[in-house]
Design a protein with these regions (language model features):
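Charged catalytic cores and adjacent phosphate/nucleic-acid-binding surfaces used
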Residues: 1-112, 121-182, 188, 261-265, ...
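Non-catalytic, alpha-helical, charged scaffold/linker segments
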Residues: 169-283
């Protein structure tokens, strides 16, 4: 943290230029590149030369380097509307520690950020994050993501307590007895998920690794549980970590096998060359994402209990058995100031309406856009959900009745017993629309947008979303 403070002061005040914020962003980015190139002295020398040129603060030169590093120019008044209300650091499934995450957010020009932790947050992690954000002038919130059973699956909420004057006030809140009790329950939920991941690791060793070794004609090392947990480190064990670790252990053998095949292809028959080319393509495609989708996702392993399906077994933590309204009532009692955001992945407008009704105004925000979920095709009902949100906020009884009657007609046409039960519930809501609207007359149902970035995958966009109208003309033209 001290190094971060010194770094910010140096880059903002070393250049005698009115273009100091953008100059500082480029200087830190070049420093990162110098560190990454520590094994390549020639590249480092070139980067040091670039660094010296940028310290002049020449706007034309700085803009060139912004473009080189895929950074948008930000206004020197530093009043841009740039946000990301859903990112992860290394204490969950992200790659960067809290200090690194905040530094990168500043480089990207992000002013408002919410870092999401699963089930609990360690005080040391919260302290580092909040102090780093204070140093860099980034407005940060800490959100805790909880999963709760709803109609044979889990829905996710992000609870972000607010109203703290400084980092110490938030840390004092974490030390209060009710919060300690919640964090302890959260740790149980995370350990429950870890057991599911470790069971999948054992299945990989017993089933998937031998099959993959036979297919690719390479040795596929078995994964050691202790080594895997050491690889996860301070993070919370996840299927993403498992996929990355499996890929890491495979990579050396893949590279060696590809080299051997390329040498063999030089003297092979045309038929064998075709087989070799196909095998190399298969190896090239074996990314972390492919390993996850093909072998590690719960639906790919039906012989194991799925952590994505609610279970009332005695060993299931209480936190994962609470209905949504019970969990949210608990959270809302812990702090008078809070935001509770409903995540919309795989939810329909009917699901959202029912949750809003059940939770009686405790849901304050909808995560209307999540870049990761959108890329994966999990946000198919955003238009209908947005229409519902607008109708609730406008206070239009006629509009809400129209939406509800359309839902009821669809449910009436279904032969499912669950749809009939939901239809009866929606008729009750139809007769009590003012009760649905009442909590949102004072504080409208708002939205949150985020990327769900973990800084891991090269096939996904990084963190940060910007309102183009708040950016300089050159950046808008570039977009």
């Amino acid at each position: 943290l001290m190094a971060l403070r010194i770094l910010r002061d140096e880059v903002l005040h070393s250049a005698r230029t009115p273009f100091r914020y953008n100059t500082g962003r480029v200087l830190i980015q070049i420093m990162k590149e110098i560190i990454r190139s520590r094994q390549d002295e020639l590249t480092q020398l070139k980067l040091v030369h670039d660094f010296r040129k940028v310290t002049s603060g020449n706007p034309r030169l700085v803009r060139q380097f912004l473009n080189t590093y895929h950074l948008l120019e930000m206004p020197e008044e530093w009043n841009q509307l740039t946000v990301d209300h859903h990112v992860h650091d290394a204490n969950t499934k992200g790659r960067k520690n809290a200090t690194h995450l905040i530094m990168d957010a500043w480089i990207k020009g992000i002013r408002y950020i919410t870092v999401v932790y699963y089930n609990y947050v360690e005080p040391a992690a919260a302290r580092e994050l909040l102090q780093a954000a204070e140093i860099m002038g980034v407005d940060v919130r800490i959100g805790l993501e909880f999963r709760t059973p709803f109609r044979d699956r889990f829905v996710c909420f992000v609870w972000a307590p607010r109203g703290f004057s400084d980092p110490e006030a938030f840390l004092s809140f974490l030390a209060e007895r009710p919060m300690v009790a919640l964090m302890n329950e959260g740790r149980k939920a995370s350990l429950w998920m870890q057991r599911h991941v470790m069971d999948t690791l054992q299945l990989w060793n017993a089933k998937h690794a031998p099959a993959l070794a036979e297919e690719l004609e390479i040795p596929v090392p078995l994964l050691e549980p202790e080594a895997f947990l050491a690889y996860v480190g301070t993070g919370q064990t996840s299927f993403l970590h498992l996929a990355e670790y499996a890929h890491k252990t495979l990579l050396k053998h893949l590279v060696q096998r590809v080299k051997a095949l390329q040498e063999e292809a030089l003297t092979a028959t045309s038929e064998r060359q075709s087989q070799i080319a196909q095998l190399i393509r298969r190896m090239d495609m074996l990314t972390t994402e492919v390993i996850m989708e093909t072998w590690l996702k719960p639906e790919r392993n039906p012989e194991l209990p799925s952590p994505d399906v609610p279970d009332n077994a005695p060993d299931t933590p209480e936190l994962l058995r609470m209905p949504p309204h019970v969990l949210l009532d608990w959270l809302s009692c812990l702090r008078s100031g809070y935001r509770i955001t409903l995540q919309l992945a795989e939810l329909t407008a009917e699901d959202v309406l029912e949750l809003l009704w059940d939770c009686q105004g405790m849901i304050t925000h909808l995560e209307l856009f999540n870049l990761k979920e959108w890329q994966e095709g999990h946000l198919r009902h955003l238009t209908a959900i947005n229409d519902l949100q607008i109708a609730i906020n406008k206070g239009s009884v006629l509009h809400l009745k129209q939406i509800l009657r359309g839902m009821i007609r669809t449910l009436e046409a279904s032969s499912s017993e669950k749809d009939k039960e939901r239809c009866a519930k929606f008729r009750i809501i139809l007769r009590n629309i003012p009760s649905l609207q009442a909590p949102y007359k004072v504080a409208p149902l708002r939205i949150r947008i985020g990327t769900d970035s973990t800084s891991h995958s090269g096939v996904r966009h990084g963190m940060g979303l910007a309102m183009p109208e708040t950016l300089p003309h050159g950046a808008r033209r570039q977009i």
